[in-house]
């Protein structure tokens, strides 16, 4: 829903626009998402999480993030996150065309 609202507000800037958001998670994500229009920067600001990336060739990568660490989700890479206790992260996302699928 957040991507739909962003898309409506930022339609004029298209793929050049970025959605900047911060979320706190207390459990692992229940879905995957993918941003075809550009890379996404994920900055962990508190707690820890493991970002799970699925590349187009099917290869999986896990990136452990603690407070102060960051990762980049390249365009077209499906990603989700595992959270053991709690994590807060900032996301800088090329939100146009974002897709979701169940985990």
Named regions from a protein language model:
Residues 55-75:
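Short acidic-glycine-tyrosine-enriched beta hairpin
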Residues 48-50, 69, 88:
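Structural motif
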Residues 17, 38-41, 86-87:
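Short, surface-exposed beta-edge/turn micro-motifs
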Residues 15-18, 25-28, 46-50, 57, ...:
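Short, charged/polar surface micro-motifs in flexible loops or helix N-caps
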Residues 1-32:
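A short, N-terminal "cap"/entry segment at the start of jelly-roll beta-barrel domains
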């Amino acid at each position: 829903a957040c991507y739909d609202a962003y898309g409506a507000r930022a339609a004029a800037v298209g793929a050049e626009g970025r959605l900047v958001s911060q979320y706190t998670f207390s459990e692992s994500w229940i879905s995957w998402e993918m941003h075809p229009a550009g890379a996404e920067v994920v900055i962990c600001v508190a707690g820890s999480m493991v970002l799970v990336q699925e590349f187009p060739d099917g290869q999986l990568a896990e990136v452990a993030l603690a407070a102060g660490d960051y990762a980049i989700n390249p365009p077209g890479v499906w990603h989700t996150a595992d959270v053991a206790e709690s994590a807060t992260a900032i996301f800088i996302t090329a939100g146009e065309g974002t897709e979701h699928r169940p985990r």
